[in-house]
């Protein structure tokens, strides 16, 4: 037993890394809190900068692959160009993350449906069709990209997601990690639905959604089954619970898929993994010392 335990612990410490799953990582980060034609927000730019830093520092997103558009940079044209560039740059074994912090809006359609929009800095609520980014565009971009995994994190509330509610594989599925990291994934998590409000507080210095997104990723709190991986599905469940509570039920995050693929966008926190690996090595060293002393006593 003593000889097997170090092997098991060491194997656990050498879990899959980001490089084992993805060849490259790409991100488009958008934050707008100073609008030209609609009300301002307080922390969208700070939220966007925090997420960009977290991706680069903890999750192996190369700085050259992370595009950040803030306030006056986040125009209708620049956002569309950014979406096109990041999605087309990714290759077949890459991942793409798109984060937006700003206003969302919902338009009623003549057929009784609804369309959600992301509002660029110059957006006009009475001219959404010509001044804003429809959610259908996100779905189209996700289908055009070669990337293996794509995740949209939208810190805005609106309806008309144009996505399905399908759930992914259960973590109890045999070879779960192997399956979710090889199959394609097109996933989206939004801060809330139509008629809800993005909650920001000075005591947080963030919105409720991004504050909890940071907690989920930075401290591995989004790793609900403690297997060392944070999947987009786990992230959605974590955000739904925490944001609903912190916002006093003013917003409830929504998680959806654009396709029926069963893959999962995966986050592996390299900083947390270093801590785990160092702890594992210390435990192995301790057990080996005990084994050595036991042999000497015999």
Positions of predicted regions on the chain:
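Sec-dependent N-terminal signal peptides
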Residues: 3-12
């Amino acid at each position: 037993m003593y000889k097997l335990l170090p092997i098991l612990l060491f194997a656990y410490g050498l879990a899959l890394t980001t490089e084992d799953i993805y060849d490259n990582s790409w991100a488009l980060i958008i934050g707008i809190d100073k609008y030209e034609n609609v009300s301002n927000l307080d922390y969208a730019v700070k939220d966007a900068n925090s997420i960009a830093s977290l991706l680069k520092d903890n999750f192996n997103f190369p700085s050259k692959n992370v595009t950040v558009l803030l306030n006056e940079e986040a125009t209708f044209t620049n956002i569309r160009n950014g979406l096109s560039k990041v999605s087309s740059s990714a290759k077949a074994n890459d991942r793409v993350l798109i984060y937006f912090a700003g206003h969302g809006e919902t338009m009623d359609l003549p057929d009784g449906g609804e369309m959600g929009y992301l509002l660029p800095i110059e957006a006009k609520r009475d001219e959404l069709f010509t001044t804003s980014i429809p959610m259908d565009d996100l779905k189209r971009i996700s289908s055009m990209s070669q990337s293996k995994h794509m995740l949209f994190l939208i810190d805005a509330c609106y309806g008309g997601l144009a996505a399905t509610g399908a759930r992914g594989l259960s973590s109890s599925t045999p070879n779960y990690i192997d399956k979710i990291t090889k199959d394609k994934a097109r996933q989206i998590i939004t801060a809330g639905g139509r008629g809800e409000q993005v909650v920001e507080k000075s005591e947080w210095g963030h919105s409720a959604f991004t504050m909890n997104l940071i907690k989920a990723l930075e401290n591995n709190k989004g790793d609900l089954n403690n297997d060392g991986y944070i999947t987009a599905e786990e992230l959605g469940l974590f955000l739904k619970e925490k944001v609903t509570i912190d916002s006093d039920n003013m917003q409830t995050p929504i998680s959806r898929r654009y396709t029926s693929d069963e893959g999962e966008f995966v986050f592996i926190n390299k900083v947390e993994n270093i801590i785990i690996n160092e702890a594992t090595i210390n435990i192995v060293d301790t057990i080996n010392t005990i084994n050595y002393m036991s042999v000497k006593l015999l």
